[in-house]
Each structure stands twice: as C-alpha cells, then as structure tokens.
Curated annotation (Swiss-Prot):
UniProt keywords, alphabetically: Disulfide bond, Secreted, Sensory transduction, Signal, Taste, Transport
Top-level taxonomy: Eukaryota, Metazoa, Chordata, Craniata, Vertebrata
Disulfide bonds listed in the record: C79-C171
Protein name: Lipocalin-1
Tissue expr: Mainly expressed in lachrymal and salivary glands. Also expressed in the prostate.
Amino acid sequence: MKPLLLAVSLGLIAALQAHHLLASDEEIQDVSGTWYLKAMTVDREFPEMNLESVTPMTLTTLEGGNLEAKVTMLISGRCQEVKAVLEKTDEPGKYTADGGKHVAYIIRSHVKDHYIFYCEGELHGKPVRGVKLVGRDPKNNLEALEDFEKAAGARGLSTESILIPRQSETCSPGSD
C-alpha cells in the first residue's frame, strides 16, 4: 500500500509541455508552506484506492534544495499519512524520490499561486504517471483547472478521469 501511496502522492509533480516551464530554483524556494490538492489524474486505475479526502499538503525546503512533502489522505476509511523527500537534480524543477524509482517535476502554472506536479515511476512492476494541481488557497480556480487539463492532456493523460478531492483540515475516518 505504501508504494501505491507514494506513487500517487508523488504525482504531486507537474506536466511538461511547451507552454509550461519547469520552476526555477528561486521559485522552488518559495514553495515551502501549505498547499491544497485541487485536482489529480493518473494513467492507471487503482480500484483498491478510494480517495475520500485530503488534508493540506506541507512542503518544506531542506538543505541542498531537496523538498519534503507531507500530506494525510482518507483512503477507504483509513487515514494514511504520506511523507516523501524529493531529491533535487541538476535540472531546475526536476526531483527524484524513492531511490530514483520516481522522477518528479514541479511546473509553474499560468495561474498565480498554483503549480502542476508531474511524476513518472513504477508501481507493482508497471509504469505509472500522474499529474496534480496544487494551490495556496483551498477554493477551486477554473482557470487553474483549465491549465491543469491542458498539461495533463499534453502528457497523454485522460482529462475524463480527473479527481477533485474533498478538502479537510484534519483526517477523520467515518466523517463526511
């Protein structure tokens, strides 16, 4: 279950396309703090994973430019805390995680205070790709969602299966 959560959580890192640019090192310094998962899509179905809600995600800039991401998700009635260290590479906006098994990209959105996260990795021996939209404010932003859909589509991911998770300040199993 942890590799599945890591793969999906690392989908927090954005889609590459011509009109989306990787975030610069200076911009990455500004990503520390609280972020809200606004939308996500992956290229595979995970029937065993019923994402019910998410808490705000915390990103922390570590020494050497690495990032730590922490989020708690209510999945199939159970709170799952996910914590990952994203290791900086020589390419701005590009990170690796889980011993290099996952490659993550932070891409700036055209909408202020929003980023699109894209991740490629492997889960149960099969390749998996995911895209997430995060923003500083929990309210949905249609312009940011349109930007996200374009980025997901440009990477070959379905825009028909976009999930917009319910926001929750804390994880409480059994709450609605």
